[in-house]
Amino acid sequence: MDALVMAGGRGTRLDTDGEKPLSPVAGRPLIDYVLDALDASGVASVVVATSPSTPETAAHVSAPIVQTPGEGYVADLDAALADDRLARPTLTVAADLPLLTGAVLDRLRRAHESGSLTVAVPAARKHELGVSVDTTFDHDGRTVAPTGVNVVGGEPSRTLVVDEPRLAVNVNRPGDAAVAREWLRS
């Protein structure tokens, strides 16, 4: 399975002067943690999706780049997935998950059976950790939040809910960065 890192967002909620994927957490850029996790996983290859908003990120990474139009997550995802270097199913990972590990990614890849997979965590877990919850949806009577990790394949599409703190901490706001720093230092 190939992997696509989504690294084209402006990161306006993070309130940083620089590009979000390069925002430091515990002394390292966010995207470096994600790329290290992918390197430690069993993915076949990694492509990074950047946009006109993230030229320094494109220069920073050594992985192949696909330039997207910077028109929002869904439009950029569609543009990136059209790149012929990515075979379906494709593991997609947001660049703002500094606690991610290769072992967690491999568990998710093994959980993928066919089609597409949306990976979510209980919203209650995010609240317990003290990180922001911007989007939620109901799944089997539980309020869950998307993690920023998915498998894009086709139909059928299913949701996998995992109570994994490493997937619950995505850095969208300054408080999220503080929580991630504490985890990385412990």
Question: What feature does the model see in each segment?
Answer:
Residues 18-24, 166:
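Short glycine-enriched, charge-decorated loop/helix-capping segments at active-site entrances
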Residues 60, 100-186:
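Conserved core of the sugar-phosphate nucleotidyltransferase
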Residues 3, 88-91, 117-119:
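Generic beta-sheet signal
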Residues 7, 50, 94, 120-121:
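Short beta-strand/turn micro-motifs composed of small residues
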Residues 1-18:
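N-terminal nucleotide-binding beta1-loop-alpha1 segment
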Residues 13, 54-57, 99-100:
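Short, active-site-adjacent cap segments at secondary-structure transitions
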Residues 24, 30-94, 137-139:
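Conserved N-terminal catalytic core of the sugar/cofactor nucleotidyltransferase
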Residues 9, 96, 173:
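Active-site glycine-centered loops adjacent to acidic/histidine catalytic or metal-binding residues
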